[in-house]
Amino acid sequence: MSIEVSNESGIDVSEAELISVARFVIAKMDVNPAAELSMVLLDTAAMADLHMRWMDLPGPTDVMSFPMDELEPGGRPDAPEPGPAMLGDIVLCPEFAADQAAAAGHSLGHELALLTIHGVLHLLGYDHGEPDEEKEMFALQDRLLEEWVADQVEAYHQDRQQERDRRLLDKSRYFDN
């Protein structure tokens, strides 16, 4: 799976965390592991321009998704297998997200993880234009975020245990001689 991140926002964010959450959601949603995703982080002025150009709405927004058409290969039945699908682009605005995070009482990292999940779900065809769609998408988004956080906590604890085990083994080597 190829996930490219381009941070043009001027705000320092954990690109590794964005890749981690995107990779987690793509795997959980059973997307082909060879899929490709592009993520761009913009400042509020650039996001406002993009928001006006594509959505005809003034001002910046937190996340925009631009799906590619390659997800549905179509074509002749005897055509060769298509290559890795390009899911599309997710555009995030960390400055806008920071304001939302402060209002919600959580970190920017948490907000960007949530928005990354939201963006991936849009690329996979989920929408929230209708009340039923919104309920389904936001419930899935919340569940995926909860599962990703639990996965991160488990990985952290495993890393700490491995470090403790390594130190214990190092100490025990002093007594072997």
Curated annotation (Swiss-Prot):
Q: Where this protein primarily resides, as one coarse class? A: cytoplasm
Q: Name one Pfam family in it.
A: YbeY
Classification via InterPro entries: MetalPrtase_cat_dom_sf_prd (IPR023091), YbeY (IPR002036), YbeY_CS (IPR020549)
Gene Ontology molecular function, alphabetical? metalloendopeptidase activity; RNA endonuclease activity; zinc ion binding
Q: SUPFAM superfamilies annotated for this entry?
A: Metalloproteases ('zincins'), catalytic domain (SSF55486)
Please indicate if the UniProt record lists Cytoplasm as a keyword.
yes
Q: What is its EC number?
A: 3.1.-.-
Broad class of enzyme this protein falls into: hydrolase
PANTHER family, alphabetized = ENDORIBONUCLEASE YBEY, CHLOROPLASTIC
Function as written in the Swiss-Prot or TrEMBL entry: Single strand-specific metallo-endoribonuclease involved in late-stage 70S ribosome quality control and in maturation of the 3' terminus of the 16S rRNA.
What this protein is called in its record is: Endoribonuclease YbeY
Q: Which organism is it from?
A: Mycobacterium avium (strain 104)
Gene designation per UniProt: ybeY
